[in-house]
A protein has these predicted regions:
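Juxtamembrane intracellular "pre-TM" segments in multi-pass secondary transporters
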Residues: 3-11, 190-220
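Helix-breaking motifs and short loop linkers at transmembrane-helix boundaries and internal kinks
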Residues: 46, 78, 99-105, 133, ...
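Conserved MFS/SLC helix-loop-helix module at the cytosolic interface between two early adjacent transmembrane helices
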Residues: 65-104
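Helix-to-loop junctions at the C-terminal end of transmembrane segments
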Residues: 67-78, 265-278, 361
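Helix-loop-helix hairpin linking two adjacent transmembrane segments in secondary transporters
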Residues: 105, 134-135, 139-188
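Cytoplasmic helix-loop-helix junction between adjacent transmembrane helices
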Residues: 109-148
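C-terminal membrane-cytosol helix-exit motif in multi-pass small-molecule transporters
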Residues: 176-196, 383-388
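C-terminal transmembrane helical hairpin of 12-TM major facilitator-type secondary transporters
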Residues: 280-323
Length: 400
């Protein structure tokens, strides 16, 4: 337990976890609002796919940058203050996106969103670490990861459905309303707790020391490669579904993201399994399942493509449900900074994953996108095997 105090009563913990999850849903919904809209943005602004993808890359890169600041800020100022303040401020650029007059203006506003989103995404797990005993932490983190999946699902599906009938600007208005509701819920229901105990410079120094820890570096590498692989598939999926032989409409493309529902189900299960099975083994299992899903998407059938996406989601969120709690438990100090670094590497991977595969798409089509995703998953598996395992287990494996 941290200095935040004892674990809250069950009723309070339930309400607080609900508010934490609601804020997480709002933050992730804002992050992914443009993903199903890329063909629509390409048509309106006359952009090739890789350029339209900057509306995703900009927010993801800004999240990576913002994550470096959010963790130490939460260590110094308090988790609740950073989360509620960030989510409240996020309403402003989200509303402004609905009024953007050019694509560069939209990209700049998306970057502003990205700087604020880590105030929730990079701090939520650290807040859970302050308020839950170790035996309950992985389950709580699983709930937060499930909320992130729900937010991604809401952002993608709702924005596509709204845009099809009311235009892409209306999707940002909906996102702003969801964000405001999340900020209010967090402000009312989260106990303050976890009073700041480290000055800014001390918190930043603690975060930087994590970069010398082999096992934490393994967790950061896993985060980078995992999200690269995942966002590569889902960023360029709309182009594949809009092209022959499928030729799907924007709302039909958005409905393909309903496979995210599987992530909502699997994340808490993976968190509970990690209390009985070594997290490193479950991470590898998740990566293997993800690779299988990506391979299946290469089939020419729409049904098999959707099945592959479903398998990919199950594998991705099996591994992702374990990564943040692994980092939180491995870090010996500045846990907010450790979680922030995990998110920073995660979104740096997402930045490259939302842009680089666009070049592969232009040259090799979907096979190029799937190939880059599979390479990233292989690199993630190597990081788990050689960096994440405890020292004794690693020596045993090398001796064998």
């Amino acid at each position: 337990m941290s200095a935040a105090g004892p674990t809250p009563p069950v009723r309070l913990a339930s309400r607080a976890t609900g508010a934490l999850c609601a804020g997480t849903v709002a933050a992730y919904a804002a992050m992914y609002v443009t993903q199903p809209l890329l063909p629509m943005l390409s048509a309106e602004f006359g952009l090739p796919p890789a350029t339209a993808g900057l509306s995703v890359s900009a927010v993801v890169l800004a999240i990576a940058v913002g994550s470096f600041l959010a963790g130490p800020l939460s260590d110094a100022l308090g988790r609740k203050a950073v989360m509620v303040g960030s989510l409240a401020l996020l309403v402003l650029p989200t509303l402004a996106c609905a009024m953007a007059r050019s694509f560069p203006e939209l990209v700049a506003l998306r970057a502003a969103q990205g700087l604020l989103i880590p105030g929730v995404t990079a701090v939520a797990v650290a807040w859970a670490g302050d308020h839950y005993a170790p035996g309950r932490l992985r389950t709580a983190v699983g709930a937060v990861i499930a909320a992130s999946v729900a937010g991604g699902l809401l952002g993608r599906v709702a924005s596509g459905l709204v845009a099809e009938h009311a235009g892409w600007r209306a999707a940002f208005l909906l996102s702003a309303a969801v964000t405001a509701a999340g900020a209010i819920g967090m402000g009312l229901e989260l106990p303050r707790g976890g009073t700041p105990g480290a000055p800014w410079r001390g918190a930043l120094g603690g975060m930087l020391r994590h970069l010398r820890d082999r096992r934490l570096l393994g967790g950061f590498a896993l985060a980078f490669c995992l999200f690269f692989a995942f966002i590569a598939v889902f960023t360029y999926l709309p182009y594949r579904l809009a092209a022959p032989p499928f030729r799907l409409s924007t709302d039909a493309i958005a409905s393909a993201y309903l496979v995210y529902v599987a992530g909502i189900a699997v994340s808490p299960v993976a968190g509970r399994l990690a209390t009985r099975v070594a997290p490193e083994r479950l991470m590898l299992a998740g990566l293997a399942i993800s690779a299988l899903g990506v391979a299946v998407t290469l089939a020419g059938s729409l049904a098999l493509l959707v099945a592959g996406l479903l398998v990919l989601v199950v594998g991705m969120f099996t591994a992702q449900a374990l990564g943040p709690s692994y980092v939180n438990e491995t870090a010996r100090e500045a846990k907010g900074g450790a979680n922030a670094l995990y998110l920073a590497f995660y979104y740096l991977g997402g930045t490259l994953g939302s842009w680089l595969p666009g070049l592969a798409w232009q040259r090799w089509g979907w096979a190029g996108v799937a190939g880059t995703s599979l390479l990233a998953l292989g690199a993630a598996a190597l990081a788990v095997v050689f960096l994440c395992r405890p020292e004794g287990a690693l020596r045993h494996a090398q001796g064998a």
